[in-house]
A protein has these predicted regions:
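Extracellular glycoprotein-like low-complexity segments
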Residues: 1-121
């Protein structure tokens, strides 16, 4: 249970806004999501240092698709639906010194396209 930078964003499918960065113990749920990009990720956040070096790229799935986990919906083929905005948190090890976040989204061909840069204030 190590402290980490926990970075919060408010996002819509087309635009992310920086909310805050704290040093704290990430919640278990957040640590489970701290992973490299995989095929299920629609969105990713690249963490860049002051020298322009990519420290880590974190897959965040699709934060704009809410899944239903209610009793009575288990037999549905699609358990969820789109949402217009989401709060997004990522955890970054303290030895990294983030300066810039690059938000990218997968295009129709499955390639990630950067669509926004957010510099730490």
């Amino acid at each position: 249970e190590e402290d980490a930078y926990v970075v919060s964003f408010k996002g819509t499918p087309r635009s992310f806004a920086f909310k805050d960065i704290k040093i704290q113990k990430p919640k278990g749920r957040l640590l489970k999501k701290l992973r490299f990009i995989n095929d299920d990720d629609e969105y990713a956040i690249k963490v860049i240092d002051k020298n322009g070096i990519e420290l880590i790229a974190i897959g965040i799935g699709n934060p704009f698709y809410a899944t239903y986990e209610h009793i009575g919906y288990e037999d549905r083929e699609f358990m969820g639906g789109p949402v217009s905005s989401a709060n997004i948190e990522i955890a970054i090890p303290l030895e990294f010194k983030p300066e810039l976040f690059i938000i990218s989204k997968r295009d129709n061909l499955g390639k990630f396209k950067d669509f926004q840069e957010i510099v730490l204030p």
